[in-house]
């Protein structure tokens, strides 16, 4: 078969969402397309998709929204031929805000956008690769006020 060159570096990016929504944006689709190709190339690879919201809205609403976001990313990969069992979707709600923008803190749309993400983590891979997690941040800031 094709031996994977040792030291292949897999770079994984976070994907981002619009406010209150869970649809897969264009930038996210590009990342997930690349991820599905990687998962086909490395058959042992299993991933965790942990989805997060910004702090606006109730904890319950955000928990549900994050589950929908994780599921949307999961479904997207499965639609591209990845076995569902290799993907573990997790909805984290607003539990892991990455900046100061917790409940009641005034923040810009940019700052809120940074929190609306799914983080992709490799939880298993048998092939000899190194993994790099990068975050260029969202390519689009959703400024729509619902």
Features from the language model and the residues they span:
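Periplasmic OmpA-like peptidoglycan-binding domain that tethers envelope proteins to the cell wall
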Residues: 50-146
């Amino acid at each position: 078969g094709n031996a994977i060159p040792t030291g292949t570096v897999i770079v994984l990016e976070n994907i981002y969402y619009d406010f209150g929504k869970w649809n897969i944006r264009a930038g996210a689709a590009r990342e997930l397309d690349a991820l599905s190709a990687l998962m086909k190339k490395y058959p042992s690879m299993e991933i965790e998709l942990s989805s997060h919201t910004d702090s606006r809205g109730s904890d319950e609403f955000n928990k549900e929204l994050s589950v929908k976001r994780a599921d949307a990313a999961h479904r997207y990969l499965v639609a591209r031929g990845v076995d569902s069992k290799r993907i573990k979707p997790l909805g984290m709600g607003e539990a892991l805000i990455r900046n100061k923008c917790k409940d009641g803190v005034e923040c810009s749309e940019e700052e809120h956008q940074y929190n609306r993400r799914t983080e992709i983590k490799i939880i298993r891979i048998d092939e000899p690769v190194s993994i790099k997690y990068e975050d260029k941040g969202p390519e689009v800031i959703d400024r729509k006020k619902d």
